[in-house]
Amino acid sequence: MTTQLEQAWELAKQRFAAVGIDVEEALRQLDRLPVSMHCWQGDDVSGFENPEGSLTGGIQATGNYPGKARNASELRADLEQAMRLIPGPKRLNLHAIYLESDTPVSRDQIKPEHFKNWVEWAKANQLGLDFNPSCFSHPLSADGFTLSHADDSIRQFWIDHCKASRRVSAYFGEQLGTPSVMNIWIPDGMKDITVDRLAPRQRLLAALDEVISEKLNPAHHIDAVESKLFGIGAESYTVGSNEFYLGYATSRQTALCLDAGHFHPTEVISDKISAAMLYVPQLLLHVSRPVRWDSDHVVLLDDETQAIASEIVRHDLFDRVHIGLDFFDASINRIAAWVIGTRNMKKALLRALLEPTAELRKLEAAGDYTARLALLEEQKSLPWQAVWEMYCQRHDTPAGSEWLESVRAYEKEILSRRG
């Protein structure tokens, strides 16, 4: 520990103590908040089922930065490199298309054995795993419908895929001792004016009920459902809208997923957390950065990321909110993208933990909105960075931008050889 870091740390403790904040307690609380990193940033959502296939489902990864992972071994190595540069607890979020098999496996036939390497790797790295069925980039999703498909056989294929995915998710939780959150997102929708908006939603409702009909141990598996406003090619109608899934999660008591990019550009999910928590047992967050649409840019330490973190901390939702990331930028170094986005999420959580929330509540309850605003703004200038640097030091990770040197070295030694 450098003398400079020690001095900054001691001064920061004093400054925060003056406003009633115990920084050591804040760091202990930060270690209770794992962030689930998404595997698909590492290979532009290609997966291993058909890596040369097209990405469909109304989503898009733009850019052609060299060095993307081409197989599971490379992806795990890249994840390890990124995780070494991110302090504190982490999880990994997998999609079904990241299975490993020597022979082709139909999506409705995936089994835990196809993910055993991921589980062994997670054990070795002390990680929890989360999961997602992959209802896109497949011949049977090519017409834009999956769980709400009008064709019974196609709809059943996707039902069976989701049911198989739940068993994989439960396997993760059983093996790793921490529940796997399995999120269902489907791209179903229509490009232009839709006459019958009801029937697809009726089919989706029945399909989801069949998907979750098998009772699984909640200590191993948690169901979540995710809405979206629109996607490319589904601009006019999305079957799984916000209202549909809020109603579903409320009535079936599943977790609800709120994705930062899946709403109108003027909406923010930070304002939805406290409302949804009144009706659903748990929330899954997909923290992202939409630029004009669901562009999935790398997460910044911006106002909305901070507001999301503050909602979790202010309302003590540590055990009811699962924090995941969802972005994929192929125009920059993919490992750097993971590091930047995940560190920013953790910085936002730390800043929220360093807020004098009790004092702010008193001011708000007393109607002293002048003092509330003044204190909120003044606390932004408190030396939270010194606390962050100590947190990084204790977790043996770089405190500042020196992490980029490690990424550049890895890029030169490993990524540059991938072609």
UniProtKB/Swiss-Prot annotation:
Protein family (similarity comment): Belongs to the rhamnose isomerase family.
Pathway annotation from the record: Carbohydrate degradation; L-rhamnose degradation; glycerone phosphate from L-rhamnose: step 1/3
InterPro entries: L-rhamnose_isomerase, Rhamnose_isomerase, Xyl_isomerase-like_sf
Residues that bind Mn(2+): 262, 294, 296
Gene Ontology process terms (BP): L-lyxose metabolic process; rhamnose catabolic process
EC number: 5.3.1.14
Example of a GO cellular component annotation carried by this entry: cytoplasm
Source taxon at top rank: Bacteria
Cofactor descriptive note: Binds 1 Mn(2+) ion per subunit.
Described function: Catalyzes the interconversion of L-rhamnose and L-rhamnulose.
Natural source organism: Escherichia coli O9:H4 (strain HS)
Compartment(s) of residence: Cytoplasm
Chief place of localization: cytoplasm
Protein name: L-rhamnose isomerase
Presence of the UniProt keyword Manganese in the record: yes
GO MF annotations, alphabetized: L-rhamnose isomerase activity; manganese ion binding
Record keywords, A-Z: Cytoplasm, Isomerase, Manganese, Metal-binding, Rhamnose metabolism
Pfam families: RhaA
Cofactor names: Mn(2+)
Quaternary data: Homotetramer.
Catalytic activity: L-rhamnopyranose = L-rhamnulose
Alphabetical list of NCBIfam families matching this protein: PRK01076.1, rhaA
